[in-house]
Every structure is written in structure tokens, then in C-alpha cells.
Swiss-Prot record:
Lineage per the UniProt record: Eukaryota, Metazoa, Ecdysozoa, Arthropoda, Hexapoda
ZnF PARP-type: positions: 7-89, 114-203
Binding site for Zn(2+) 3: C291, C294, C308, C318
Record key words, sorted: ADP-ribosylation, DNA-binding, Glycosyltransferase, Metal-binding, NAD, Nucleotidyltransferase, Nucleus, Repeat, Transferase, Zinc, Zinc-finger
Domain of life where this protein originates: Eukaryota
Name of the protein in its database record: Poly [ADP-ribose] polymerase
Gene Ontology CC: nucleolus
Amino acid sequence: MEIDLPFKVEYSKSSRASCKGCKNKIEAGILRIAAMVQSAFHDGKQPNWFHEQCFFQKQRPTSAGDIENFENIRFEDQERIKKAIDNCTTVISAGGSKKGAKRSKGENNAIKDFGIEYAKSGRASCRGCEQKILKDQIRIRKTVFDTEVGMKYGGQPLWHHVECFAQLRGELGWLDTGENLPGFQTLKSDDKADVKKALPVIKDEGVSSAKKAKIEKIDEEDAASIKELTEKIKKQSKRLFKFRDEIKNEMSKDDMVALLEANNMEPVKGDSEKLLDQVADLLTFGALLPCTDCKGRQLLFHKSGYLCNGDLTEWTKCTKLLKEPERKSCKIPGYLKYKFLKDVRKNPEVRAIRYIPPSTSTILKNISLKKGDELDGPKVKRERPPLYNIEIALIAPKEREGIVKDRISKLGGTVSTKITEKTTVVLSTPEEVERMSSRMKKAKTLGLHVIPEDYLEAVEQNGAGAINYISSMSLCDWGTDPATRITQEESKSSKSKSIYTKSVPKSMTLKIKDGLAVDPDSGLEDVAHVYVSRNKEKYNVVLGITDIQKNKNSFYKLQLLESDMKNRFWVFRSWGRIGTTIGGNKLDNFSNLVDAIVQFKELYLEKSGNHFENRENFVKVAGRMYPIDIDYAEDSKIDLSAEHDIKSKLPLSVQDIIKLMFDVDSMKRTMMEFDLDMEKMPLGKLSQKQIQSAYKVLTEIYELIQGGGTNAKFIDATNRFYTLIPHNFGTQSPPLLDTTEQVEQLRQMLDSLIEIECAYSLLQTEDSKADINPIDKHYEQLKTKLEPLDKNSEEYILLQKYVKNTHAETHKLYDLEVVDIFKVARQGEARRYKPFKKLHNRRLLWHGSRLTNFAGILSHGLKIAPPEAPVTGYMFGKGIYFADMVSKSANYCCTSHHNSTGLMLLSEVALGDMMECTAAKYVTKLPNDKHSCFGRGRTMPNPSESIIREDGVEIPLGKPITNDSLKSSLLYNEFIIYDIAQVNIQYMLRMNFKYK
């Protein structure tokens, strides 16, 4: 996969661009350098162009390898840029503090990137400890140029506490004394002394030795061969650019194209400079033969060789890179009479290459883009001040305000005179509490404690008691837990978010008309609807494409809108990157339908490569987008937790369980856990066909893993999967899918998605009965009888014992508390199970699943994975898995500290004769004399303590025993059946997972 380089160089194609430094025009034909920044308007990078001399004032490249197209500029220009990069030192050495010592030009430039001052506010955070820098505290600046903001705006100031800067100064590049920091002279005398003490001179021996090692390394290499290679590149560059200049001045574009095609080479389209490079390379070194992998005829010189620009498949670019590609002599068509063509040599020549790798920071940035930010905590550990993140509102005498504010600030707190939702506590007097002003009344309404000024003295003496003192020293008889009112610090991961993801709305409200949603960005949702033809053709399209090679995760929405009242039409389209604010939209107005349809179809063809009329037989075209099959139905507006005019006839515990199973927020949280895009793929909108296609792609990836597939095939399948199931990666690059763990995780996601789709479709079902409570309606839709058990009944106590006894020793993260037990009778299931009721070896066994899956499970029963699903994750093949240890199944409920409610099933399972296994064995068909598979684990419930019910069903509720002599790779028993009729769900338990 390509490395995303931060800079680009070329000879300007025209004089339209302006320099981002001096703001003057960049004349055509001169060298210009760009910082490549994320475009705010489309899913890709855009160049911010600079004059060569202006570029180095605003940017700090550390390697010529970071500059795209560097290898295609003149040799003398390359050398000059490399020299300028060498002058871009980012380390301020101790030399400047010596008398008479002069700094280098690079150091003088870099010293401007540092500064010291008093914090103007308390908003900025320290980049070392990640805590806020309080107002009037000393802070030190390092301006960086390699961040998203720094690249875009020519530098981003990052602030540090003095102590944190001191610990990171080697990394930040300041080895000099603190008194040489710009701004030092503005500090107070005491503060100057503190800074000098914290930042003494560091001798830069380490830097010198690094330089020395570099020189020694070069000496060890064959200096003669380096010189020879450099001379060869210089000569070749001179000859190549002689041709290039003559081609540019004399040859027409048509003749360039004809010359390339005569040599069986595909001309570059849409980039005049690259076309010039391609023709000059042909005349200098000979004609390139087609790529052996994809048969592509466009190989372009790129960094360390010739990169094929062809397509391996309609989903994947070719990744072939050749250092010495095969060539043949350049053919000159007889009708081309340019004089300089006589200088073309008969025999092809090998192009000399000097590869300059990208800088370490660029490589690391690309790795983090692929993997996502690692949450490794702050770089510097620093104790927080006692009132950190505590906002104190003052209702105090004016004469005390200044003194109190200073004390609070020194303790790390923030002060306000307004009382808001963000206020933690109010500092006031007993008299003010007695007086009960409007502000004090508001404090009471918000449940804010009122504390005296003595509180500050107590905190100054013992900072650890800051929270407890609020309650113990309170002057009022009201107040909620103050700990819940402290502002939660933003996590590192959210701080490192892109500027294009921080303001993305979590969801959007769609107004549905005739089953189709008008995009609210059009501004026409109240006056127009999506046009549907007489043939029921819906002029509403969502296209998408994910390309991990180019870090693209794009969408394109296209709608033909018709006015609700007048004979008026619009074509609306919006585009961008999924999960970000990157993108734009456009609305075109039409007075007649024919013109609107023509434009709609032209745009569809342009973006997808397919005619709108043929969309049912869509064929993916390389580099073009693919339709996402989304069915926009009316969003559910039913709030099951709200009061309803008609009372429910169900027991309260059953009502609660229905609310849980049909909780839309819970469904949305589950989808967001899987990084699914909630705007392009809202709840209940992705078609079954699309999900089945995604299953097939996962199966294909699994087979590639098993068979050792090529990287290109993994890229191809990854692009297809993420296009079918839109994911929100923000500005991060979509990860390559090439491990069984990823396949298993995504299979579980699709399993959950199917069940969520099922539950949501039940929520959408229209019901003619208006005289029924919504909870009762959804209960009826499940076609399942749920009867709560009496908590004092023998049955309840027996099942509670089953839970208590079979919690495995290795599952210590949580305890299980039984909240409710329901007797379950699914409609038609007893009849289906009847033939197996006579089978021997029937047991009551556990099955756990996500809470959001249960509406689907109860409405259609437990299911076996579809044929198109990958086999990964199924130790014993595709079947329904059960356990006799409660915690073994409980782990599949996917609960957490924050979502601690889970549902579990106890089912009567007809096991009959079991095929016993002690290690993974993928079962596609059981032997004729077996009814189920038994994965025997080393630990199991004591069989002698099992209870046999009157109907012959075994309840294995004995305490665990371990068979140390058994050689098994399984810790606990697993029971698998391959026929859904062998299951009869009998109980559902609502569990509280009490995490430790």
C-alpha cells in the first residue's frame, strides 16, 4: 500500500495558483512545492502550493523522501532542495548560549518555533501531561508542522508546562538554556530563576555522536560507487530534461499520445506534467513493456522504480513496482518530423535510481493511520491539582472575590459567577443561603452544595479530600453527589481526533414521504419529495467506495426531487468522506422533468460507470462507485418508556423485558461499537441481500487466509466488504482485513446486524389496532409467551442454584445476579420439537447472546449460520452452541460496566448419541449414528449432583469438578446441534452482570 507523503513538488502547469506564504501568483513553469492537506470539500488530499523559498518558511520537511514527485524534477533542483532540508534543523543546541557563538541559519529559523509566556486563559492543554494549563501559569510553546492543523495552516503551537517541557526537551529539540527561549525577558524575576533552574544547558554530545555515526556509516560504504551513481543520475537527468524541454516547446499533445501508443504505452490522462515525464522517459530510456500482472500499459517512474498504474480487478489497483522493467527500443512513427527525435538512441537503457526513504515520522504516521491511535496515556505523568476540573460559582461579597479567585486558581479550579449545568459547587456564606436569592434558588434546583471559604483552607492542607469536603462542609440541606458533577476529562483518543470529525452530528432526522427520505441538506424536505416514475423507478441513489490503497471511504448521494405543489424539479447531490464533515453538496433547479432526468442519469453514469436503466444488472467499473442498497422506511417514533393512554396488560417484569429488547438506543450503541456508519446506514435500512453479499466476502477472505492469498487479493476483498457495509473510520485509513480474528469479529457484527434488522422491522410494523399499548403490540409480534416465575417457587430457586453453582473459576471479571426468570413458550416450537422429545440424553443447557439479538431470537428461534457466512469462529462447524457452565455462555452476552444487563436462555436440547471431541473439529455432517457433537472440557458440573426432571431432562447444576488426567484443549464442555428442531427454549433469565 502506498505511503501517504506530506509534500509534493512539480513545475507549475499554469499561473493560476497563488503561494500560501507570500500570497503572490506562482508563475507557470517554475518549481513549486506543496503541503498536501486533507481537503474539506472532497475525500482526498489537496496541495497548498508555495514558492520554493516561501515553502521553507512555513514547513519543516526532514527528508527529501517525504516529497512526492521529487525523483522527477531536475537534478540541480533536487540537490538544492536537499540542501534546504538539511538547513531545516529542528534541534536548538547549546551553542547559542556561549559568548560569541553564532547560530546556524537553520537554528535561527527553528528558534522562532519556540516561545515562553504566561497562559492567557485556562483553555489550552499541555501536550506532555494532557492536563489544562491554568490561566497565568508559565507555558512553553513548540510550533509543529507535521500535524493535520500544522500542515494546513503552516504551523500549530503546542503548549507545555515548564516541568513537562523539561522532561520532553530532547524529543522537542531544545537543548539550550531556558533563558534563550523567545519571550523569556517578559517573565517576572522569580519565574526567570525557576525556568533557568528547570532548563539548564544540555551538552549536545548525543547529537554530535549521531552525526559522527552517520559519517562513519557512509565511509564504510563504497564512496566511489555512490559518486559513480550520482554522476550517472546527473547525466541521465540532463539528457532526459533536454528531451522534456524540447517536447514541451515543440510537440503537440496529440503527437505525444500518438508516440506513446505507437510504443504500446498508455498515455497519462488529466496531468500534462506527468504526460511530459512519460514521453521524456520513453525517448531517453526506451519503451516499457506491459505489466505482467495486470497487462496494464502505464508504468510511471515513482521513487524506487516503475509503478504500474493499471487495475488488477474492478476493485483494486495493481501494486507492481519494478526497479529495472523490461524495455525495447523506442519506435518513432515516420510522420513525426521533430529534429530532436534524431537524438533518440537505438538501444534501451536502464534508468539509474537513488532511493531516498520517507522520514521516520511519515512512516509512523502512516502506520497510526492504518491502525488507529494507540491509547498509551500521557507522555508525562503529573499530579493533578486538587480542584482540577472543578468549577466553583461565587455568591460572595465583592471585596472577597479577587482573593477567593486567586486561591481557587492556585488549587487548579475554575471560577464563575454564573450557575449552570457545568457548575460543581457554590462558594458562599450562611447569610446568602438564608437570603435565598434567585441564584441560590437555581443552585438548589440543580442540587449544588454550598460551601464556605474555609473549604479552600481545608483543601490547601489536604488536597485528597477536595471532593469529600464538599459534602461534609456544606452550608445547605440539599445537594447531590458532587463527584457526578465534575467535568470528565476528554480522552486522548478524542483529543487526537481529526478536525473533520469533532463536529460530526451523531445522527440525523429524516422526513419520509411515500417511503423515501428527502436529504435534509437539500433544504427541500418540507416542500419536495423524491420523484418516482410511473414504472415505480425511484430516483434516489446512494453510492459508495472504499479504497484502502488511496485511503478513500467515500459516499455520493443523488436524488431527483419533485415539488409538492408546483411543476418544479431539482437534482440534489451530496458527497464526502463517511463519518466526517469532509464533503459538499449541490442543488440544480429545473423547470421540466425531462432535463432533470437527463442530468440525474448523466451523474449516475459518471460516478458509477453504469447506465441508470441497467442498475439491476450493475457491473462494478474500476475506480468508480458502487450502489449501497438502502431501504428508507419511516423511522420509529414509538418511545416504549413513555406513558401511554392505554395501560399494558402485561406483568411489569415482562413490560421491562420488552422495553429492553426493543430499545432503539441500545441497537444504535451496538452498531456504533462495530464502527458502522449510522448516517449512511441508519437502523433497519440495509437490505438482506447486501448483508448476504458481505457474508460471502468474509468467507472469501477466510479462504484467502487459509490458502495464503496475495496482498492484492486481500485489498480487493477488503475494499468490497467496506463498500457493501459502510463503516465510519473518520480520517483513519480503513484497515486491511487479513486475519481470522478480524473475520470472526465482522461475522459477529453481521450476525448482530441481521437480528437488529429483525427487531427494528417489528418496531416498524403497522398495526390497525389502536386500542393496544405499544408494549403489548410488540409482545404479540414475538409470538412467544413469557411467564415470570415466582421468586419463591422451587423452579426459580432451582435455576438460581444452576447459575450460582456453574460460574466458572476462570470467569472472575463479574458476578451474575438473577433479576428475573421467565418461562418461555415459542409459538410452534413445542410441535417442532415433539419428535425429539422421545430421544434419550436431553439436557437443560445455557445459551448467551447480545441483548439486541433477543427480539429476533424469540420471534424466529435460535438459528444456524447461513451457508454464505465464513466458517471462522465455529470450533465444531456451523450449529447452535450450548454450555453447562453459565459463565461460558454469559461471555457471549457482550456486556460491560456501562451496559451490565444481559439476557440468557435455558433450552431443552435433545443431544441423543454424541460425537465426542477434545479438540477443534469442523463438522459439516455428523456420522449417521450421532445426533450431536460434544466438546469435552476438563472442567464440568459434577454429574453426581445433576437433577433429573420428571420428564427425563437432566439439569447439570452440580458444582464444577476438574479432570486433570483428561487431555483436552477445551476448558469447559460445549454441546452443538445441527438441526434447529432439536432445541426447545424453556426459560429466559434477566441477569445483572456485577463487574468487579
